[in-house]
């Protein structure tokens, strides 16, 4: 591994010479504070995120934080003794028959969803690897491109497919509660922090907003702080409505929302959109007006993820690099790369925002394994051995509150016994 110390690309501001972005969002800081090097101890024991613009501190429920955070120097020693649990899906009939395209944990980390090219959509209990304890959700007629749990409802799942539909599921009742036809191949989704908005991306470079209206219930922070009204867990009465599409003039890939809760006083939202030009556009929602542009990579930007601390925005590119952007000033602090790297089609952060990993599904790009990087230094600190020397990694997802890392591999060639499938480092008695 080498950390490419490139000169930070310039960030483009839209018609504003004052150093601030237009639209009244100041510098769009989404971190609640500016950590010094590896300063994440304040997360210990926390049960909420306060990851918002500097003008708008609000509460976002999440899984409880672990009190024992791993430091860079400890990581390799701890992970070296951790086992990897495999989850075998009966839908896998042989090498390459069951490539998982997408992974997603629910907010509490008690469930993980897998969406596959063979149309299999399955919900797993990470503590019980046997498929008999999993749930098979059926209905899609094309490859499943993306799965995503609601950030505010632990049993609500969304999936999008090449069949041109977006489906919403209640995983407790194993039913599809809504089906929306988006008129073309859908391949990416992102959900706003309050669960009220989803944006779906199609392969024709059209973004489609979806309004999600829940029955609301007041939510109180464990310390007695009254938070926003969040959706009730009671099923029913939720409506899903596809709004007017927003065609984009350039190739549009992954999207993500910040961890910012809109309020009646500050209803504005923003969304990050990666493009085939190597840029990341920060857009106002729901207008989709561009307020800021990051010149992130020399080729297409394919994946994007905001650190749970709000400190960094990670962008994966087809140039085999992951760039880390400081959200306090929108400067690229460092780039990460692997010796055998390929196009980075997925990127994920550990719950404490210290460690980041990328997914490359090209055969051979994983080399000797899956590399984990320390965000603050850019160092490669541990490599997880993956099945098959030539296997690619199609998807990665850190657990929302533990040092468990879920990933899936692609087939590693004709005659191989490796048929991909879900693997979780640390789960089911694995040691973390």
Outline where the language-model segments fall.
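Loop/turn segments within WD40 beta-propeller blades
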Residues: 103-109, 148-154, 190-196, 256-269, ...
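Blade-level signature of beta-propeller repeat domains, shared across WD40, Kelch, NHL, RCC1
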Residues: 393-432
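Short loop/turn segments that connect beta-strands within beta-propeller blades
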Residues: 126-129, 171-174, 212-215, 285-288, ...
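Conserved beta-strand element within WD40/beta-propeller blades
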Residues: 112-116, 157-161, 199-201, 271-275, ...
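Intrinsically disordered, low-complexity acidic/Ser/Thr/Pro-rich linker and tail segments
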Residues: 2-102, 228-229, 236
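Short coil/turn segments within WD40 beta-propeller repeats
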Residues: 98-101, 118-122, 142-145, 163-167, ...
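WD40/WD-repeat beta-propeller blade N-cap
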Residues: 87-100, 137-144, 180-186, 231-235, ...
């Amino acid at each position: 591994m080498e950390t490419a110390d490139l000169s930070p690309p310039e960030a483009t501001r839209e018609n504003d010479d004052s150093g601030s972005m237009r639209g009244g969002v100041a510098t769009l800081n989404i971190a609640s504070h500016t950590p010094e090097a590896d300063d994440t101890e304040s997360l210990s024991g926390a049960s909420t995120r306060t990851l918002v613009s500097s003008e708008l501190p609000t509460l976002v429920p999440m899984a409880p934080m672990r009190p024992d955070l791993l430091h860079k120097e400890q990581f390799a020693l701890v992970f070296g003794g951790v086992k990897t649990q495999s989850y075998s899906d009966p839908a896998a009939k042989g090498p390459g028959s069951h490539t998982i395209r997408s992974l997603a944990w629910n907010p509490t980390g008690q469930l993980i969803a897998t969406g596959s090219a063979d149309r299999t959509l399955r919900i797993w209990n990470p503590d019980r690897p046997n498929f008999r304890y999993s749930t098979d959700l059926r209905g899609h007629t094309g490859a499943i491109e993306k799965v995503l749990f609601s950030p505010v409802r632990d049993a609500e799942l969304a999936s999008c497919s090449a069949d041109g539909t977006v489906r919403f599921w209640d995983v407790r009742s194993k039913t599809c509660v809504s089906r929306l036809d988006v008129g073309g191949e859908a391949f990416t989704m992102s959900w706003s922090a309050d669960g009220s908005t989803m944006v779906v991306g199609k392969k024709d470079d059209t973004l489609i907003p979806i309004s999600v209206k829940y029955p609301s219930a007041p939510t109180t922070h464990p310390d007695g702080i009254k938070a926003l009204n969040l959706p009730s867990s009671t099923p029913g009465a939720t409506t899903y409505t596809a709004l007017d599409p927003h065609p984009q003039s350039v190739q549009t890939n992954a999207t993500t929302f910040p961890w910012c809760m809109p309020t009646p006083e500050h209803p504005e939202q923003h969304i990050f959109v990666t493009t085939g030009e190597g840029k990341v556009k920060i857009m106002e929602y729901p207008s989709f007006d561009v307020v800021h542009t990051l010149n992130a990579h020399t080729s297409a930007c394919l994946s994007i993820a905001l650190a749970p601390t709000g400190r960094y925005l990670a962008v994966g590119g087809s140039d085999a690099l992951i760039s880390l952007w400081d959200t306090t000033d929108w400067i690229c602090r460092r780039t990460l790369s692997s010796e055998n790297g390929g196009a980075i089609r997925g990127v994920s952060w550990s719950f404490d925002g210290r460690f980041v990993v990328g997914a490359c599904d090209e055969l051979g790009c994983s080399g000797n394994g899956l590399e984990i990087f320390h965000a603050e230094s850019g160092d490669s600190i541990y490599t997880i051995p993956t099945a098959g020397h030539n296997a690619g990694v199609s998807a990665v997802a850190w657990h929302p509150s533990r040092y468990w890392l879920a990933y899936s591999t692609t087939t590693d060639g004709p005659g191989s016994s490796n048929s991909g499938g879900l693997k979780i480092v640390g789960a089911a008695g694995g040691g973390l």
